């Protein structure tokens, strides 16, 4: 019994020490926490979706679902070859050219009317463990040092595949402003970013950047958390309005009424960036199934749709290229 208790104590201490690493960030505090408490989207100690959103829908429970994900046979959820990719010299791009460069999964660079926007950059392993959630072979072409100067860094939520400590800290001195959902700014402040350059938004809020540029924070149907405790920070979608463009950044999340709401508020969207991958019937409300994607595209009515959240990490059991085939069939 003494040996068992000693081993258990050592294990608990090791986990606590591991989770005290800076990558995990820290919980919101002070004035930021008081603002969170005042949010209409925060109730009973956690942020809430607009509609009831169970994270798991299989009825199997969290541990059984995780066991299936880790050990159930998966058909082609990772490619068996290096994926072909083109590496663009981002620093040589004409800053006046309107364009989007995708880095795989949910990381991409947008240039719109001279504004450089970097969204959810993750150029390393999408987990705190170096051997877990590694990128597919051939998809890790870009590194933080390849990025040009960034005017606006947008983070949609704090999950490991969207917010990476190693990436953003290496970009800190080349980033003009960070825009993120309420509570996520705590990570950036903890990681050494100037608080004056951090803009946190709740759903329904907006930030004028000057020069005809505005960022609007709107709902998403998802959840948050980098530790065992979920939903202490908000998750969101964003609309970036430039002098000539309206761009929807969907972030992560399941289908809901917010897509139609965004379309009514921002008609004639030029581009909608939508998640298309890492879905499962086991968590159908927090990631869109293929039929949900089709409905979201129709609800938004954007002139162009760019599907992301695929082709770099295996976070679900579906074949790795199925999301691409689904998008091509729209």
PLM region spans:
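Metallo-beta-lactamase
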Residues: 1-128, 132-134, 140-146, 181-251, 326-330, ...
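Cap/insert and terminal regions of metallo-dependent hydrolase folds
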Residues: 4, 8-9, 15-45, 152, ...
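Active-site metal-binding motif and surrounding structural segment of the metallo-beta-lactamase
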Residues: 39, 131-179, 267-273
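Catalytic core of the metallo-beta-lactamase
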Residues: 105-111, 208-268, 284, 291-292
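Divalent metal-coordination and catalytic microenvironments
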Residues: 110, 120, 157, 164, ...
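Acidic/histidine-rich helix-loop elements
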Residues: 121-140, 223-229, 280-286, 314
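Active-site metal-binding loops of divalent metal-dependent hydrolases
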Residues: 121-123, 158, 220-221, 251-253, ...
């Amino acid at each position: 019994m003494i040996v068992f208790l000693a081993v258990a104590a050592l294990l608990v201490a090791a986990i606590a020490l591991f989770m005290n690493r800076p990558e995990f960030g820290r919980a919101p505090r002070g004035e930021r926490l008081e603002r969170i408490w005042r949010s209409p989207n925060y109730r009973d100690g956690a942020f809430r979706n607009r509609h009831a959103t169970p994270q798991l829908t299989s009825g199997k429970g969290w541990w059984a679902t995780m066991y299936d994900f880790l050990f159930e046979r998966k058909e082609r959820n990772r490619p068996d070859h290096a994926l072909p990719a083109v590496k663009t010299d981002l620093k040589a791009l004409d800053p006046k050219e309107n364009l989007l460069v995708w880095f795989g999964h949910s990381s991409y660079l947008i240039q719109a009317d001279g504004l450089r926007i970097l969204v959810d950059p993750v150029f390393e392993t999408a987990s705190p463990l170096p051997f877990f959630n590694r990128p597919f072979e051939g998809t890790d072409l870009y590194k933080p040092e390849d990025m040009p100067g960034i005017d606006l860094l947008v983070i949609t939520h704090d999950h490991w595949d969207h917010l990476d400590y190693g990436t953003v800290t290496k970009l800190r001195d080349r980033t003009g402003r960070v825009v993120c959902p309420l509570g996520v700014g705590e990570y950036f402040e903890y990681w050494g970013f100037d608080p004056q350059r951090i803009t946190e938004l709740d759903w329904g809020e907006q930030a004028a950047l000057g020069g005809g540029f505005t960022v609007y924070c709107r709902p998403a149907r998802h959840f948050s958390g980098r530790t065992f405790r979920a939903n202490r920070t908000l998750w969101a979608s964003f609309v970036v309005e430039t002098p000539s463009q309206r761009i929807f950044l969907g972030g992560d999340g399941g289908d809901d009424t917010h897509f139609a709401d965004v379309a009514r508020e921002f008609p004639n969207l030029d581009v909608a960036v939508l998640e298309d991958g890492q879905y499962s019937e086991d968590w159908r409300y927090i990631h869109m199934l293929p039929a949900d994607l089709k409905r979201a595209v129709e609800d938004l009515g954007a002139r162009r749709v760019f599907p992301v959240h695929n082709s770099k990490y295996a976070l679900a059991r579906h074949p790795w290229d199925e999301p691409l085939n689904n998008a091509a069939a729209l």
